[in-house]
Amino acid sequence: MSSAKYVVGSKPTEKRPKDIKSIKSVPICEKHRASVVKDISRKISRIQSATLPEYQIRDLNDAINRLMREKHEWEVQIRDLGGINYLYNKAKLFEDEGEQISDIDDYRYYGRARELPGVKELFEADMSFIPERQRKQEMQKRRLDAWYFGYIPPAQESLLEDFEAKIEEQQHKHLENLGDEVEQDWKPLVIEQIPTRDDVEAILLERRKNALLSRIS
């Protein structure tokens, strides 16, 4: 599958495909993963600069997190195609591996992003002693995307579906083994509608508005 080309300056560069699952060649996946790793390394080096303005630090940090997720998707595809399993490789790839504020989500802060107003204080604070309501407000101040709420990209949906099918089969077997111990009026839980991306964005927008209002009042 050929990819489109774009030009940065005078050097033509191959644009990585968005539909990672459509790439069925391990060498091509490896090439794109290497490209992502190179982009991450450059941005991690840049975010260490003492001359960067605050808005560029935030944009760079967001970009690094997006690239980290893309790297993970390529590694999943490489593994599924029978290539190297990078997911179990704990070798350090980057000079800065980033830090999480808490285990609530996987968003990481790199370089000078850890010194941003509000972020630095959160790293210094012991989040376990902050009341739940205040902790939620602090998390809402960040740019949360669908990943934060557990909505995975289409490229990984098949993996989740396979996992859910396996768990569902195990649960059915478990219930069959229980026999008469299962209550007669037991009914399976039916989820009629899963939120769309637009629904998630609307929820996030509403939460941001509420967070701003709580800070103003």
Swiss-Prot record:
Please cite one Gene Ontology biological process associated with this protein.
generation of catalytic spliceosome for second transesterification step
Task: Return the similarity comment.
Answer: Belongs to the ISY1 family.
Q: Which PANTHER family match?
A: PRE-MRNA-SPLICING FACTOR ISY1 (PTHR13021)
Quaternary structure, per UniProt, is: Belongs to the 40S cdc5-associated complex (or cwf complex), a spliceosome sub-complex reminiscent of a late-stage spliceosome composed of the U2, U5 and U6 snRNAs and at least brr2, cdc5, cwf2/prp3, cwf3/syf1, cwf4/syf3, cwf5/ecm2, spp42/cwf6, cwf7/spf27, cwf8, cwf9, cwf10, cwf11, cwf12, prp45/cwf13, cwf14, cwf15, cwf16, cwf17, cwf18, cwf19, cwf20, cwf21, cwf22, cwf23, cwf24, cwf25, cwf26, cyp7/cwf27, cwf28, cwf29/ist3, lea1, msl1, prp5/cwf1, prp10, prp12/sap130, prp17, prp22, sap61, sap62, sap114, sap145, slu7, smb1, smd1, smd3, smf1, smg1 and syf2. Interacts with sde2.
Compartment annotation: Cytoplasm; Nucleus
What GO cellular component is one of the record's annotations?
A: post-spliceosomal complex
Keyword tags: Cytoplasm, mRNA processing, mRNA splicing, Nucleus, Spliceosome
Q: Which InterPro entries match?
A: Helix_hairpin_bin_sf, Isy1, Isy1_sf
Its job = Involved in pre-mRNA splicing and cell cycle control.
Spell out the Pfam families in the cross-references: Isy1
- In Swiss-Prot or TrEMBL terms, this protein is called Pre-mRNA-splicing factor cwf12
